[in-house]
Swiss-Prot record:
It comes from the Bacteria. Keywords: Ribonucleoprotein, Ribosomal protein, RNA-binding, rRNA-binding. It comes from Porphyromonas gingivalis (strain ATCC BAA-308 / W83). GO terms for cellular component: cytosolic large ribosomal subunit. Binds to 23S rRNA. Forms part of two intersubunit bridges in the 70S ribosome. SUPFAM superfamilies: Ribosomal protein L14 (SSF50193). This is Large ribosomal subunit protein uL14. Belongs to the universal ribosomal protein uL14 family. SMART domains: Ribosomal_L14. Part of the 50S ribosomal subunit. Forms a cluster with proteins L3 and L19. In the 70S ribosome, L14 and L19 interact and together make contacts with the 16S rRNA in bridges B5 and B8. GO terms for biological process: translation. InterPro entries: Ribosomal_uL14 (IPR000218), Ribosomal_uL14_bac-type (IPR005745), Ribosomal_uL14_CS (IPR019972), Ribosomal_uL14_sf (IPR036853). One of its GO terms (molecular function) is large ribosomal subunit rRNA binding. CDD domains: Ribosomal_uL14.
Amino acid sequence: MIQQESRLVVADNSGAKEALCIRVLGGTRRRYASVGDIIVVSVKSVIPSSDIKKGAVSKAVIVRTKKEVRRPDGSYIRFDDNACVLLNAAGDIRGSRIFGPVARELRGTNMKIVSLAPEVL
């Protein structure tokens, strides 16, 4: 459950370490985003000598949330952190690696993220 001003870990090797959610996409009154949703983020911290700069605005897809997500079989999945993967203007992921596990809910729309992830829960 991510909303404006939520801080997220960036789970790819694009060069960004932390991002701040500045908008949840998908409607004018939409307040929260969950796993698989696309948000607009501002990069808050980067690794030295990275292509991405601090303050850069980018779209991102959420891959992990602390708030549990209910599955159709009645089970729940939750993670230890809130994490996202940065996207470019075309909607493809910016990095070439994904760090940490990702949720199975990404299979429908983000197969590239699922194929690069070390573990899908």
